[in-house]
């Protein structure tokens, strides 16, 4: 095998994995420095998971939140975020998080709803899409009244 052939094979293998990384959905980690500004983004819903690393219920979620992020790709009105209440205690105190995990939906900076349903991607996605539509309609009505 020539030197060129030996270099081509690893490059092909590497290129096979690049699209996977480019398609990887982004779950945005929110911190005390970014939380307030992000959830106040106009006409944007933020579905946020509040957890701590030591919580067995949070650990049990596995890749659920990342899978939801992938499922929500392409929806410009909905962002998926997470807050580590161990390192971002101020955020969790501000929004009154008392148990883990807690899932909250925000729209235009306001809390819309807490999710307490089944913990699977389909249920989470259905919830966030439906609640975001309601929040957007409400915001449009309020804008018209101004």
UniProtKB/Swiss-Prot annotation:
Checking PROSITE patterns in the record gives: THIOREDOXIN_2
Instruction: Give the signal peptide as a residue range, or say none if absent.
Output: 1-25
Q: Membrane-spanning regions, if any?
A: none
Recorded hits in InterPro entries, A to Z, give: PDI, Thioredoxin-like_sf, Thioredoxin_domain
Against Pfam families, the record matches this protein to: Thioredoxin
What are the alphabetically sorted keywords of the record? Disulfide bond, Redox-active center, Signal
Which cysteines share a disulfide bond? 55-58
**Catalytic residue positions:** 55 (nucleophile), 58 (nucleophile)
Q: Where exactly is the site Lowers pKa of C-terminal Cys of active site?
A: 119
Sequence ranges assigned to domain Thioredoxin in this UniProt record: 26-133
Cellular component per GO, a single term: cytoplasm
UniProt record similarity statement = Belongs to the protein disulfide isomerase family.
Q: What does this protein do?
A: Acts as a protein-folding catalyst that interacts with nascent polypeptides to catalyze the formation, isomerization, and reduction or oxidation of disulfide bonds.
Identify this protein by name. Answer: Protein disulfide-isomerase 5-1
Source organism per entry reads: Arabidopsis thaliana (Mouse-ear cress)
């Amino acid at each position: 095998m020539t030197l060129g052939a030996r270099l081509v094979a690893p490059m092909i293998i590497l290129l096979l994995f690049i699209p996977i990384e480019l398609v990887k959905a982004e779950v945005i980690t929110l911190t005390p420095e970014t939380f307030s500004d992000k959830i106040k983004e106009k006409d944007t819903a933020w579905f946020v998971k509040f957890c701590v690393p030591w919580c067995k219920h949070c650990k049990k979620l596995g890749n659920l939140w990342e899978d939801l992020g992938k499922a929500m790709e392409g929806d410009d009105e909905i962002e998926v975020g997470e807050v580590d209440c161990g390192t971002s205690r101020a955020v969790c105190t501000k929004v009154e998080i008392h148990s883990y995990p807690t899932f909250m939906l925000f729209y235009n900076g306001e809390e819309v709803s807490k999710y307490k349903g089944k913990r699977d991607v389909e249920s989470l996605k259905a919830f966030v899409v439906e609640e975001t539509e309601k929040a957007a309609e409400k915001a449009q009505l309020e804008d018209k009244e101004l």
